[in-house]
Amino acid sequence: MKVNKESMLVYAITDRHWTGEKTLEQQVDEVLKNGATFLQIREKNMPHDELVKEAVLIKEIAKKYNVPVVIDDDIYAVIESGVDGVHIGQKDMDYIEARKLLGDDKIIGMTAPSVELAKKAEKLGADYIGAGAVFNTSTKKDTKYAPAIRHQPKRYLVSEKSIFNLREDYYSRFFQEK
């Protein structure tokens, strides 16, 4: 499954620490049932073998909704679980090596927190580009968010492959014209 404009409308990212009483699978099913069109499994502290098992279960749930699934950082978990692709950051495996391992049929998304890095990611062939956090976030302590993007978002949209991580309560403020 490849990325298209429709699949990038609502990009959901997992974090099992926020699921409350529900299992990760229950939470994923609910999110996809309610309209998420793309899913990233981002479980930073989950052991590799457990991540692969979770990814296999989540892949089956996503298949019901025809939603692509990528795993954050762990290319080998992608290969072992058979999910649709990987999302890599600037400090992860480089794009060329990732593409060699995954082949042309898998999705590779990249984080690019600047216009320069986004253009580089697009030139390399990334299927989509994430700008990262545009506001401070409690879910990613080491983030260097990009406040300039929130003041002129249209200026920073390098291409239709660009995405931003926005909480719902920030969305309307973010896209208001200045």
Would you name each region that the model predicts?
Residues D127-K178:
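Active-site/ligand-binding-proximal alpha/beta "capping" segment
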